[in-house]
Amino acid sequence: MSIAEFAYKEKPETLVLFDVDGTLTPARLTVSEEVRKTLAKLRNKCCIGFVGGSDLSKQLEQLGPNVLDEFDYSFSENGLTAYRLGKELASQSFINWLGEEKYNKLAVFILRYLSEIDLPKRRGTFLEFRNGMINVSPIGRNASTEERNEFERYDKEHQIRAKFVEALKKEFPDYGLTFSIGGQISFDVFPAGWDKTYCLQHVEKDGFKEIHFFGDKTMVGGNDYEIFVDERTIGHSVQSPDDTVKILTELFNL
């Protein structure tokens, strides 16, 4: 633990990590003033960080332009892009790991499958290529908030994403990939081990005695599951940002 950097905190050996969508913000929407104030209070007591599957630009939209200064740790794409006290750490690349030939086969299968799904609505950006993963959305990431809510209800009834994931697992069993359903409208595809637990390697040297994690998709198959059940963390399952504030207030006497 670096005394000089974190000694001012009441609990410098405690780290609290947060998922973004559904935990700090409503899905794809911006953070509320109540959550911001709660996090500011919490940061005086212990170290805080966020870890999400989206790239940093989307997290800046949701959490604000000063997010790198307001969190001790900032983990985009599950920690493949990482910042500690505003300074960038080493990153990884999905395409370099998988290779162009395999990625082409994967992308062609995904696009063909997307074209054959029976859906009431389609919008745009069905396959999003990121540094550390790809994100697949049957309705498309350009869907409005209302359309996202509609798809989420439709998906719960028809299991569109779950069936899609099973088809991918069957088609590419030897690719070493993980398929993780998260948010309302999409799922992530990334190398095994590149889930949210990936970010924990960035904090190992700081010697935290307690690492708490707050997330909403903590069920098996959800994109918070692996870090939620990891033996290195104390997991907290939440239903909404309001729920996050409530638990934090009680747990840390804010």
UniProtKB/Swiss-Prot annotation:
Q: Identify its protein family.
A: Belongs to the eukaryotic PMM family.
Residue positions of the active site: 19 (nucleophile), 21 (proton donor/acceptor)
Q: Which organism is it from?
A: Saccharomyces cerevisiae (strain ATCC 204508 / S288c)
> What is the official name of this protein in its record?
Phosphomannomutase
Where on the tree of life does the source sit, at the highest rank?
A: Eukaryota
Subcellular location(s): the record lists: Cytoplasm
Q: What else is known?
A: Present with 3500 molecules/cell in log phase SD medium.
Q: Where does this protein hold Mg(2+) 1? A: 19, 21, 216
The coding gene here is: SEC53
Q: Which GO BP terms apply?
A: GDP-mannose biosynthetic process; mannose metabolic process; protein N-linked glycosylation
Q: Which residues bind Mg(2+) 2?
A: 228, 230, 233
The keyword Phosphoprotein appears for this protein: yes
Which EC main class describes this enzyme?
A: isomerase
